[in-house]
Amino acid sequence: MIPGELVIDDGEHTLNAGRHTIALVVANTGDRPVQVGSHYHFHEVNDALSFDRAAARGFRLNIAAGTAVRFEPGQTRTVELVELGGARAVYGFQGKVMGPL
């Protein structure tokens, strides 16, 4: 293998297959753009984003790893979220959970 080389199977690949997803309407009520990364606990994103935070607890954006979604000031859009995997514990971010979900 060459450093940085990607070895990928042939065919189609489905991200997060079999995981529970939800759709939420999100509005940027602030005066600055807000960018949210692929693995950020959506419940704890910037407070300028207005949406059902309780519904987003334990979820992240359902997008490819290493990518992000940008919300421009005044913009409203629907996003798809996917449940967090692994041990289902959240530490850090804004410190709103700091333990098991």
Swiss-Prot record:
Family matches, as Pfam families: Urease_beta (PF00699)
Keyword hit for Cytoplasm: yes
InterPro entries: Urease_beta-like (IPR002019), Urease_betasu_sf (IPR036461), Urease_subunit (IPR050069)
Enzyme class: hydrolase
Keyword Transmembrane helix: no
Gene Ontology cellular-component terms listed: urease complex
Name used for this protein in its record: Urease subunit beta
Species annotation: Burkholderia mallei (strain ATCC 23344)
UniProt lineage: Bacteria, Pseudomonadati, Pseudomonadota, Betaproteobacteria, Burkholderiales
Gene name of the record: ureB
